[in-house]
Amino acid sequence: MFTVFLLVVLATTVVSFTSDRAFRGRNAAAKASGLVGLTDKRQECCSYPACNLDHPELCG
């Protein structure tokens, strides 16, 4: 009975560890996607003088 308990604990730990790694990978992909989106907006904004004046932090 104790052996079954240890196997369940080990299996739970492995599943939890694998899920955490997958979550961090998806989170990194989402951040990279957000940075690409910001770069596109920066190019669009900096080409318009009114937007350039309103958002100098983007066009610096």
Swiss-Prot record:
Listed A to Z, the keywords are:
Acetylcholine receptor inhibiting toxin, Amidation, Cleavage on pair of basic residues, Disulfide bond, Ion channel impairing toxin, Neurotoxin, Postsynaptic neurotoxin, Pyrrolidone carboxylic acid, Secreted, Signal, Toxin
Q: Which GO terms describe its molecular function?
A: acetylcholine receptor inhibitor activity; ion channel regulator activity; toxin activity
Q: In which tissues is it expressed?
A: Expressed by the venom duct.
User: Where is it mostly found?
Assistant: secreted
From the Swiss-Prot or TrEMBL record, state where the protein is found. Answer: Secreted
Signal sequence, renumbered to the chain:
1-16
**Sorted alphabetically, which Pfam families does this protein's record hold?**
Toxin_8
Cysteine amide modification sites are C59
> What this chain does, per the record?
Alpha-conotoxins act on postsynaptic membranes, they bind to the nicotinic acetylcholine receptors (nAChR) and thus inhibit them.
Stated family: Belongs to the conotoxin A superfamily.
In Swiss-Prot or TrEMBL terms, this protein is called: Alpha-conotoxin-like 289
Name its species: Conus ammiralis (Admiral cone)
Source organism lineage? Answer: Eukaryota, Metazoa, Spiralia, Lophotrochozoa, Mollusca
